[in-house]
Amino acid sequence: MINMKIARLVRDGHETYGLIRDGKVATKDNMVNQTGVPLPFSIMDFLFEGWYDEIKDRIISTSFQDKLETFSILNPLPNPSKIICLTFNYPKHAKEQNYESTKEPVIFIKPRTTLCGTNSEIRCPNFVKQLDYEIEL
């Protein structure tokens, strides 16, 4: 099995999605050209309507034509309804903060507006006294 990641990407103002492997990207258009499968425009349709399963065995190494560093990685999903988070999934960090681990997971939600892409700015209002970047991963 080949190890690949799925991502939303933008380059030169053009948004797309693609598969990432070894620092190279197979964009939606690359995959369509290589496989002949008419992939959907939306990453949501690609993920949740079985398209990945349709093409995963057809993807060949020549589909990965573009260097990842030529793209900006966007937040994973456009307009999710909510983000469900789990606290203390980093036990070492909890210990550093002098928090006692709980036996049960602590779950909380965040608004969808808190999502951002890789290397994007994390906005912090002036009234925030402590921003825990490890919680913001």
Where are these regions (language model features)?
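N-terminal non-catalytic cap/leader segment that marks the start of a structured domain
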Residues: 2-105
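Glycine-enriched loop-and-adjacent helix/strand subsegments that border the catalytic/binding cleft
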Residues: 80-137
